[in-house]
Amino acid sequence: MENEEPVLSAPDVQVVDPDVRAHVYSLVTALGGFNGEDADKYVLGDDALACLRDIKRWLKLYDEKHNRMDVARCLGEANLVNGDLLPILAVWANSKKQTKYMSRIALACLELLVPLTWPVELHGELTINHHRHIPYIQHVHVSYKRGLLSHASTSYLRTIIRVGIPSMAIPRSERTTRDEGILKLLLYLLRNIALITPNTRLAAEGDEEETSRSATINAFQDQDVFALLLTMCSNVGDDFTMQDVALLEILFHLIRGVSVEKLFMDDAQRTAKRTDELDDLLRQESSLRREYAKNAPTRHGRFGTMIWVKRDDAKYSTVSGQNVLKDGQATLQKMDETKKWNKPLIRRKPQDLTVHNDFSTPVHLNSTASNNLRMFVEEFLDSGFNPLLTHVRKAIEREADRVMDINTRQFLYTTAWFLEAERARRARQRKKHAESEKPAKELEPDSFGLVAGVLNQETFVFLNRAMQYALDNKDWEDLNAGMRCFTQILLTVQDMAQSPLEEDQEIAENIQNRIFYEETTHDRVLAVIRGYKDQPFGYLDACTELTHVFLRMLERYSKENLDMQVRSRRRARRKAKDVEGTGNDENDEENGSEDEDRLEAERVSKERKFDFRRFAAKFCNQKCVDTFVAFTKHYKELNTEQLKRAHRYFYRIAFKQELSVLLFRLDIINLFYRMIKGPGALDSSKPIFKEWEEFVRQIIRRLTKRLDQRPALFVELLFSKINATTFYLEYGHERQTVTRARKAPAELEIDPRQAHTIEEKISIMVPALVLDGEEDLVTWVSDVLESAVEEREAWETQEKALRDAGAENSKIPNPMISVKARDDACQQAMFSNAKLRLLMTLVKFERLGAEDVPGAAWIIPSAPRAQDLREMKSFIDKYFEKAKRGTLGRDPRELIRRKYGGGKTASDNQHNPDIQFGDDSEGEDEVPDGPLFPPNPRAAPNPANKPTKKKKRKERNPDDEDEDDSVDEETLEERRRARLENSRARLAKIKSDLYVHASDEDTDEEGDKEFFLLEEQRRREQAKRIKHALLTGMTEDGDGSTNKKGQRKRQTTRNRTGEAKSKRQRRGKQADEVDEDDDVVMGNMDAPSPMSDREGTPSGEEDDGFNFDDDLVFSRDREKLLGSAGNEEKDSNRPDKAMAQDEDDDDAPIVAANRRRMRAGFVVDSDSE
């Protein structure tokens, strides 16, 4: 053995410590062996169980403790597994009498098999000892797997399962820690067997097929491993809770790299597929040979040729070969071929090599293994998919101890693979049913409930969090698995939307609402495609597929839902107040921490209308184009679906978004040209070739046209396009942008119930500005008032002097005082700070002009006297000092609110309901408050027959002439506004009887009974009248009179009935039109009184027979009103009164039934409903 060890540095180098080797070999020898008399029978040693435990102790205390692999190598050299452990298991399995001692030995063998087959991962913390032993350990693992899978005499896997069956049979509540450990060992051994693969860097021994994936799958099927996995997976959460992660790992290593498309093919389709693949490889090989033959040396080129080429810079270059004598172009081509590009090395962050978790490398299965795996996959989808993956997701979310970082990647890939398998199985079933000659019955649609465990909101949240974490930490393999999972979820939802079951269609609609509603999902897809740099091809394939599927489904969904809304989350920062260093160091530290808290970014959410064209334009940039160009460069290895994916993206860029200039770069044009014309062109027999050929022809045609129009594009062909010049290069002129004037902030007001006088309002506004950190603005307002007081006092003094001198024009005009901003920031705050504007309004500042635009001039009018201005300044200074001392009770900002919009009448509300929808533009999407219903009609407060008492006006004292009238005016104005506010608050609580009736109770059984009795009576009377008309040829008359007045009355009644009928038809049509629009909510409409229909319709037997649309449900409520309206009802029987009332009905608005508002598929319930 020692002579076979490689010599590393010197002949006397010892790979393993001789003492360790001697101890391990002695234990293996004492374990037992084959008897000389019966060479086929293994005989255990006298103390075999103790030997097995000692070997386990050596592995644990030497290798694991010292981070070495010496004992594992010695056991591999001693052939412990194939020479001792497996024969011992065979003896235990074939013995007729099962003893407790042999069961312990079998369990000890299982305890050794797990660490001996444990996979070896390469990472950055490997030592020299590891690098010395890892190749040998990997080689020995393959031999262990070969011995476990071979079952010429004994099915070792079935025997190992027998070791764990007693623990499985015990109920979960009665299992001990030992039972759980046995099940864990059993599953870990199966995981190791599925994971072990031959090392491609080691020399092949010719028997790799015995340890291939196909052999593993066939052995699992033959030795009942699949049955064990199905049993445990279907009972995860009930009988097995701690085994979910191990089961997930087994499934992952069984299916990783397996093509779902080939798995669900039958033998004929699989053979045809492999034939096509072989034909493609042969065609590529012949193409390479033809390209090589063009420049290959010939048998006649025996004499060498060397020439000098004089270049433009007077330098000479040497070129050899006879083919350079053809022409100058061939010479330059030869020079280019001799150039060598030293590609710079890319410094990457060292990452661990996850050899055993690579799912991008394809794995080929034979026919038997494909059939066995397909049967297992179908049974797993039917019984174990939902329980296992739901339980694993919950374990990963709560970060259970048994969960490793790699399990998230395995979960996402396994979910994606089985979702694709479910879609492939359904497609296969539909195809087989369509191809069957005699379909017995129509194929019953199957629900997607089998995979519903990964289509819920919890899974979407977990997937989004995992993808964002992988993107932030640049963990590309985890992000690759997340993108595959997200893509398969989208494709599964797409199939659900096309399902014949209405339940699946509704679920698919709801899932799409949830996915596309979050703008963070849109941004993440965009960041992934734009952030590609030099990741492996599997990552490139996943991100391009996700972009293709996401854009296609989002475009279709946005077309079907025109009022689609998305929730955007932006980062908003609250302005921190300036902290003045007036305190000690501790206070400074506290204030500094408060400022940091205020400066922390907050996520604010807002709904806005979605515009797909605007979103698709975000993918029209050079980074996204470079990603798809890097993907298209592998066009020789791409299949038809992948080529179609790249073609659709470039077509969207060039023709849908009209940004073909992004493709006008030399390397991109050269790539397109080589794909069609060669060398190494696409196979012209492929169906996608025609589409690519037409696309490249149109692109080159546009390029030549643009070059003729804009010669500057010749230079731009060498570089990537930037946003500043893209529009000009595409359209020949700069983008015409229209600057939109900034909108003034919403006008604020102070709650009239909390403040009535100017001082009370200033006591609210000044602390509010101080709390917002705007002390400088308060100081500025105080300074402006101070200067205004001085100027106004000077004018008043001058006016008094002129009046005392007895001048004729003693009253000179009081000049207005201009309000000047201190700096640009103050000027900006005068327009954008709503609280400052309210304070300025309170202290009698006024804005000049009707337009409220930035930079508008503010003045102090001539009405306020110096005394008034001084008083307001004193109020500001007083409450400014209180606010700085912090002696405030309630937060004054809570007393400030948006001001109600005035000037709107009821008619305006009727014809122009104030409805606002979200838009892509930034701004505040706030719906102004207002009463839900118009006020109830009130009786006249002063009837005409009741005399009113005149109020005695208080006589004014002539001594109070000097008192200013403006104060009384302000007090009255404040009281009027307080009354208006109380009225609005009262109206907001009113639900008018015009809209809410007693019949709104759905459980009124007496009303329903009365309604149906009246309907039955009307039908009987109608049947009698029809029968009488058929027998006699005449209709019944209510009164039987034949005079002209009665004829005119009946004629008028018929006309009125026809008009009423047509009126009802028009009303019904309008109501239907309103019902068709889900987004329009009609409010503030004056409805006709409940008596309007009866008042406009004459009473009589004829009308009782034909007016079927009378609202009989409300009859009980209306009977109360019949007594008071009896005179009016008598008058309404006259033709002129009836016609007049019909005309009034035409003008009355129609109140549509209140519908639940929906936005992008979500029901928005009002609080009052």
Swiss-Prot record:
Residues 573-600, 900-1150 are annotated as: Disordered. The keyword Iron does not apply. GO terms for biological process: DNA repair; DNA replication checkpoint signaling; meiotic cell cycle; replication fork arrest. It is found in: Nucleus. One of its GO terms (molecular function) is DNA binding. GO terms for cellular component: replication fork protection complex. It comes from the Eukaryota. It holds the Pfam family TIMELESS. Residues 931-940 have a biased composition (Pro residues). Residues 973-1000, 1009-1024, 1113-1140 have a biased composition (Basic and acidic residues). Residues 583-599, 917-928, 958-972, 1100-1112 have a biased composition (Acidic residues). Its main location: nucleus. Keywords: Cell cycle, DNA damage, DNA repair, DNA replication inhibitor, Meiosis, Nucleus. The keyword Coiled coil does not apply. InterPro entries: Timeless, Timeless_N. Involved in chromosome segregation during meiosis and DNA damage repair. Belongs to the timeless family. This is Topoisomerase 1-associated factor 1. It comes from Aspergillus niger (strain ATCC MYA-4892 / CBS 513.88 / FGSC A1513).
